[in-house]
Amino acid sequence: MNKILKKILLKNREYSIGSLRKNQLMNNPLDMFKIWLKEAYKSKIPDITAMILGTVDDKNQSYQRMVLLKYIDSKKVIFYTNFKSRKANHIKNNSKVSLLFPWNILDRQVLFLGYAKKIPQDDIKKYFYTRSKNSQISVWASKQSQIIKKRSILDDKFLKLKHEFQKKVVPFPKFWGGYKINISSAEFWQGRKNRLHDRFIYKKIHSKWNIYRLSP
């Protein structure tokens, strides 16, 4: 093994920024998440709304990718994507998904499990037109998850559409939209010294959230 690679793989550190106690937790995991999200924002962590979305295909092969959190309330979170994408095809066959927020700078991570469902088109349309015009055009320029021969094909298509819609409203793409994830489980992880981390899991039983400490 290369010496530099070996050094990288053997490198570790102590997690000593904070701790997490049960009496600090909110009754609802999404309310707790909002607190941590605000603290992540104050810490100036880049891309705090980036979350790793996990899905499974029809052969039980798991996939992960980054998507952006765009809405949250006490029951659900929402993200947007192309309905012809790989992730959308997975969700069509299996609505069970996972969401992971890795906030390493704070020695924290949050894991959500839940079920994905398309949101109403009126809500999708409303959000679509809050995006920048270039972002609206990019939806039309990219056939997401499809193989392309070279980058210039994508760039040329974007520039062509940008010119076409220079003085026009970009049409709403019916093949694009949002998913709400109804949360069924949530785990909060806070790194601690000696790898004795704090972990708490929320499980919904009979419409009520129950909180349990997990061994690290």
From Swiss-Prot:
* Cofactor comment text: Binds 1 FMN per subunit.
Kindly provide the name given to this protein in its UniProt entry. Pyridoxine/pyridoxamine 5'-phosphate oxidase
Q: Which cofactor does it need?
A: FMN
A GO MF label: pyridoxamine phosphate oxidase activity
Q: Where along the chain is substrate bound?
A: 70, 127, 131, 135, 195-197
Q: What does this protein do?
A: Catalyzes the oxidation of either pyridoxine 5'-phosphate (PNP) or pyridoxamine 5'-phosphate (PMP) into pyridoxal 5'-phosphate (PLP).
- List UniProt keywords, sorted A-Z: Flavoprotein, FMN, Oxidoreductase, Pyridoxine biosynthesis
The entry's FMN-binding residues are: 65-70, 80-81, 86-87, 109, 144-145, 189, 199
HAMAP family per record? PdxH
Which Pfam families does the protein's record reference? Answer: PNP_phzG_C (PF10590), PNPOx_N (PF01243)
Recorded hits in PROSITE patterns, A to Z, give: PYRIDOX_OXIDASE
User: What biological process terms from GO does the record include?
Assistant: pyridoxine biosynthetic process
Enzyme class name: oxidoreductase
Q: What is its EC number?
A: 1.4.3.5
Gene3D superfamilies linked to this entry: Electron Transport, Fmn-binding Protein, Chain A (2.30.110.10)
Q: Which reaction does it catalyse?
A: pyridoxamine 5'-phosphate + O2 + H2O = pyridoxal 5'-phosphate + H2O2 + NH4(+); pyridoxine 5'-phosphate + O2 = pyridoxal 5'-phosphate + H2O2
Gene designation per UniProt: pdxH
Q: How does it assemble?
A: Homodimer.
Pathway listed for it is: Cofactor metabolism; pyridoxal 5'-phosphate salvage; pyridoxal 5'-phosphate from pyridoxamine 5'-phosphate: step 1/1; Cofactor metabolism; pyridoxal 5'-phosphate salvage; pyridoxal 5'-phosphate from pyridoxine 5'-phosphate: step 1/1
Per the record, the similarity remark reads:
Belongs to the pyridoxamine 5'-phosphate oxidase family.
